[in-house]
From Swiss-Prot:
GO BP term (any one): negative regulation of neuron apoptotic process
Protein name per UniProt: Histone acetyltransferase Tip60
Species name: Drosophila melanogaster (Fruit fly)
Domain Tudor-knot: from-to ranges: 24-77
InterPro entries (alphabetical): Acyl_CoA_acyltransferase, Chromo-like_dom_sf, Chromo/chromo_shadow_dom, HAT_MYST-type, MYST_HAT, Tudor-knot, WH-like_DNA-bd_sf, Zf-MYST
């Protein structure tokens, strides 16, 4: 057994089970990860009692939240536990026998509801309200438990932040932002993204050796070499905008926990990764059944069958603007097809972390990619974009459904978004910061697209090496200048040689690029795109 953080392991199961009665929300200890023999450090987010046994919802520290899970008492290693303190002082460690003083509000088992109440027609924002106790469970104590602390909140001194202090600080910050931005952070759709992994710093360019391919250009960087479109060069995580579709994420215990056990979408049964504000009565069911055409949700397969007998849709609503072979794209107006857009956001939230979901979809367009067969058009993925973006964002949110991941559909969505930008005659970029998976996909797409431009360059008639500028690359690809520069830096292709910047590509990079391109069997064909850009500033949204 591999226990991280140098914790010793005690095989006495009885003592472990006996000591778990002292554990409260906010405690940190090694936990056995599901289907592995690893014991990473985890934080207890919530506790419930089921059939006389306590179960613990844990978040593995430094791991993605999609790995969070319910574990049993025997999966906890209680030899060393970090207990949260009421006063927020230095967190101590306990070795099995010693237990902290427990507060009355946390005595016994505390079971939190799995989902907030679903907002009615009068409440558009899908922000969780104060939850009510689920049937058959003990309602949570009044106020915020002092032992609850989100992961990542401990200070550099090893302290765990007190729950009440955290709530007060969070409320102050929210009020301050409202005052600064005039409340613009509210009333907008969406799915904001926080970067989940640090960006590597570009290595220092060296004098190039003899390489077979050179692409040069005077003033290639022209003072903009330090600009990184995704904030990767300075090592800082960029802050999301407080307007448009980028709004702050309000983290609490309810939204930190997965509230849907399983969904059935067409032929696929999918286990969700994150919280989504579906109605609470549905979240208590073992599975939520979703119509793959209109995305309406039902509590049982029988209810879904009745719905399918009445549902006339066999494809997403809106206009089909692209079709090649079995792949189609539909453009959906968030104002004209509001119910579908809201259901799409609910579905996407199950697989997108660090998002705050709002039901105001009017300012957005949704582009849904489908795969066609004899039964209809089945959703593969989608991306959304603002009708009017002041910062030239061509993607607000992007998702490939889990059954279709690792098949090239993610890059196809990205390629289609840039194809739309080409039709609009401008460069575009995704809203930043990107998620971990989104960052990997975009960096891979940018690298392959830019290398494809370089390799296709031919020497001039007099035998001189080909030249190209950053602006030329942007014009050919519709990739924003900052993203082009950051990609060249991440690939370490930019070198300063004899008074000018040059891009050096060796045979190894060329072979790697060709192997990667061979895997991209599906590409966007601009001839199959039938679409005319609209000037949304001159029409009602």
């Amino acid at each position: 057994m591999k226990i991280n953080h140098k914790y010793e392991f005690d095989d006495d199961v009885a003592s472990i089970c006996e000591s778990t009665a002292a554990l409260t929300e906010g405690c940190r200890l090694p936990v056995r990860m599901h289907k592995t023999d690893d014991w990473p450090l985890a934080e207890i987010v919530s506790i419930k009692e089921l059939d006389g046994r306590r179960q613990f919802y844990v978040h593995y520290v430094d791991f993605n939240k999609r790995l969070d899970e319910w574990v049993n008492e025997e999966d906890l290693y209680t030899r060393k536990v970090q207990f949260p303190r009421r006063d927020g002082s230095q967190t101590g460690t306990s070795t099995g026998v010693t237990t902290p003083q427990r507060h009355h509000s946390l005595a016994g088992s505390v079971s939190r509801p799995t989902s907030p109440q679903h907002p009615g027609s009068g409440a558009l924002a899908a922000i969780p309200q104060t939850p009510t106790g689920a049937s058959g469970s003990v309602p949570p104590p009044a106020g915020i438990p002092n032992s609850v602390a989100p992961p990542g909140t401990p200070s550099s001194g090893g302290e765990l932040v007190n729950g009440n202090n955290l709530a007060a600080a969070l409320q102050k910050r929210i009020n301050r932002k409202r005052k600064n931005h005039g409340g613009s952070a509210h009333g907008h759709h969406s799915l904001t993204s926080q970067q989940q992994q640090s960006h590597p710093h570009p290595t220092t360019p060296q004098t190039p050796t003899a390489t077979p391919v050179h692409v040069t250009g005077d003033g290639l960087i022209s003072g903009a070499a330090n600009d990184d479109g995704d904030g990767s060069q300075d090592g800082k995580t960029p802050t999301p905008r407080q307007s448009g579709s980028m709004v702050t994420h309000q983290d609490d215990v309810v939204t930190r926990m997965k509230n849907v056990e399983m969904i059935e979408l067409g032929r696929h049964r999918i286990k969700p990764w994150y919280f989504s504000p579906y109605p609470q009565e549905l979240c208590q069911m073992p599975c939520i059944y979703i119509c793959e055409f209109c995305l309406k949700y039902r509590k049982s397969r029988k209810c879904l069958e009745r719905h399918l007998s009445k549902c006339n849709l066999r494809h997403p609503p809106g206009n089909e603007i692209y079709r090649k072979h079995t792949i189609s794209f539909f453009e959906i107006d968030g104002r004209k097809n509001k119910v579908y857009a809201q259901n799409l956001c609910l579905l996407a939230k199950l697989f997108l972390d660090h998002k705050t979901l709002y039901y105001d979809t009017d300012p957005f367009l949704f582009y849904v990619m489908t795969e066609f067969d004899s039964r209809g058009f089945h959703i593969v993925g989608y991306f959304s974009k603002e009708k009017e973006s002041t910062e030239d964002y061509n993607v607000a949110c992007i998702l490939t459904m889990p059954p279709y991941q690792r098949k090239g559909y993610g890059k196809l969505l990205i390629e289609f978004s840039y194809e739309l930008s080409k039709f609009e005659g401008k460069t575009g970029s995704p809203e930043k910061p990107l998620s971990d998976l989104g960052l990997l996909s975009y960096r891979s797409y940018w690298a392959q697209t830019i290398l494809e431009i370089f390799i296709s360059q031919n020497p001039s008639t007099d035998g001189e090496k080909p030249t190209i500028t950053i602006n030329d690359i942007c014009e050919c690809t519709s990739i924003k200048k900052e993203d082009v520069i950051s990609t060249l830096q991440n690939l370490n292709l930019i070198n300063y040689y004899k008074g000018q910047y040059i891009v050096c590509i060796n045979r190894v990079i060329i072979e790697q690029h060709r192997r990667a391109m061979d895997k991209r069997k599906i590409r966007i064909d601009s001839k199959c795109l039938h679409w005319t850009p609209k000037d949304w500033s001159k029409r009602s949204k």
